[in-house]
A protein has these predicted regions:
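A short mid-domain helix/strand-loop element embedded in enzyme catalytic domains
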Residues: 205-220, 293-311
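Active-site recognition of the HExxH zinc-binding catalytic motif
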Residues: 232-250, 388
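Short pre-active-site segment immediately N-terminal to the catalytic Zn-binding motif
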Residues: 219-239
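Pan-zinc metallopeptidase signature
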Residues: 303-436
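Post-HExxH zinc-binding segment in Zn-dependent metallohydrolases
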Residues: 178-199, 248-301, 316-343
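Short, glycine/acidic-rich hinge or "gate" loops at secondary-structure transitions
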Residues: 99-105, 252-261, 346-349
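Auxiliary, metal-adjacent structural segments of Zn-dependent hydrolase domains
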Residues: 79-217
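N-terminal low-structure segments adjacent to metalloprotease catalytic domains
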Residues: 1-134, 382, 386-389, 394-436
Length: 436
């Protein structure tokens, strides 16, 4: 029996279709999300492809499996002292003031998840829309009926055929949104188990309320085996957290800029069916897909095997995103080096540990690699840090930080080779009143 229209009333048999996808090895969370999308697609309210509830549920499962300790009063006091020291040091180096928003100095993994989940959804919804639109376009542009395996019968009327194509396209939209929500939720859950603070991911996620907030449980895990005084570890991580919080709180455009480049990437997504067919045939011939493995399709999708070829506009978007992420990390590394390298005996060991973890075991990198095929290389981050150091030498600390007023004042990859020429090519404003 096929899996398209029901035998009695000609309505689409989506339960059978979802069962077929399950038998092909598609992840259970992905199928559940697609089913939920179908059940709600008649709702009068606009529905996001990626829902906060779906992301949160998957991330919570991963957090719970690892354990989430409550934050005690002693944790708050110790980390509050570390942040005070960090902010005192940073006051003398960077232009951006610390936030005056009331906040605690420490939070749990679950607190961080709840505070950032809506930003994650906003950030990657445009990507889901782009991929879903591309899939829908493939179905709607198909001439004639879908294969009989999808229709359940060769005798459907033209109206039924068109209805099935439209409904199948809706199913694929839900499927794609759920797939991305599953991957994103898993990545966020892994992040929650590893980041040391609310801003450790080095992108603004606190909805305009960027404050320094550390995660004691993960700090203890981060410092295991280092053999370094815990107080130095806390101050070092507080410096990173406080510097990032100041950068994000005083440059609100950064959040929209990152979202805009992801949106630009998503809008450029298109699907070349012939190319995907070719990739599948080559993958099976090379043994990359085992047709006897029921999880083959899930493995192929999650590994990015059928990633569409990027357009020039998408390549530009990824270049901008990579540079923004590298410049943020590079600036943080640079400014904390300026204030702490001579004050903390273990500073060099601590910053090297940070860089090594980013390069070899970064859940944030994995999220971007899985969803956008983007990896920010450690070399690019080192180059970005060196860029900020040279800008300070040429323009001073204030001139360095004024570069963050607008994306127009940030370099592209080629600009890193000649910092002086880049600075001469842009006009950095003297008035920062619009930032503060």
């Amino acid at each position: 029996m096929g899996f398209g229209f029901g035998p009695n009333d000609g309505s689409p048999d989506f339960e059978a279709l979802l069962k077929q996808f399950s038998e092909m090895g598609v992840d259970a969370n992905t199928l559940a999300g697609a089913k939920s999308f179908l059940e709600n697609m008649q709702s009068p309210n606009e529905q996001n492809l990626i829902t906060v509830a779906a992301i949160r549920e998957i991330a919570k499962q991963i957090i719970t499996a690892k354990g989430d300790l409550p934050v005690g009063q002693s944790d708050q006091q110790k980390l509050s002292e570390s942040l005070k020291i960090a902010n005192t040091w940073l006051d003398a180096e960077i232009l951006f003031p610390a936030s005056n928003l009331p906040t605690q100095s420490a939070c749990s993994k679950r607190d961080w998840l709840d505070n950032t989940i809506s930003s994650w959804q906003n950030l990657f919804e445009p990507l889901a829309l782009g991929m879903a639109d591309a899939l829908s376009n493939v179905i709607s542009s198909t001439s004639g009926a879908l294969p009989v395996e999808f229709m359940g019968s060769e005798n459907n009327s033209p109206q039924q055929q068109e209805m099935m194509k439209a409904m199948f396209a809706r199913l694929l939209r839900g499927f794609m949104g759920s797939l991305i929500a599953t991957q994103l939720g898993q990545g966020i859950g892994l992040l929650a188990n590893s980041i040391t603070g609310a801003n450790d991911v080095a992108i603004p996620l606190q909805n305009g309320a960027e404050v320094a907030n550390l995660i004691p449980q993960n700090i203890a895990q981060w410092s295991e085996g280092l053999g370094i005084d815990p107080e130095q570890v806390s101050i070092y991580l507080s410096l990173r957290e406080a510097a990032a919080a100041r950068l994000f709180a005083n440059n609100n455009w950064l959040s929209k800029y990152i979202q805009d480049v992801i949106t630009a990437y998503g809008k450029g997504i298109s699907i070349d069916v012939d190319s995907i067919t070719r990739q599948a045939e080559e993958a099976m011939a090379n043994g990359e897909i085992d047709i006897n493995n029921p999880n083959a399709i899930n493995i192929a999708l999650n590994s990015g095997l059928f990633t569409p070829q990027q357009t020039p506009a998408q390549e530009l978007a990824l270049t901008k995103l990579e540079m923004a992420l590298a410049l943020i990390e590079g600036w943080i590394d640079h400014v904390i080096s300026e204030v702490a390298s001579d004050r903390m005996p273990a500073f060099n060991a601590l910053i090297e540990n940070s860089r090594r973890r980013r390069a070899t075991n970064s859940p944030m990198q994995q999220i971007f690699a899985t969803l956008l095929a983007l990896e920010v290389s450690p070399r690019k981050m080192r180059e970005a840090s060196a860029f900020w150091s040279q800008v300070k030498q040429l323009r001073g600390a204030d001139g360095r930080d004024k570069c963050w007023e607008d994306a127009a004042f940030l370099p592209m990859p080629d600009d890193l080779r000649d910092v002086k020429a880049f600075l001469e090519s842009v006009t950095v404003p003297d008035d920062l009143s619009g930032l503060l």
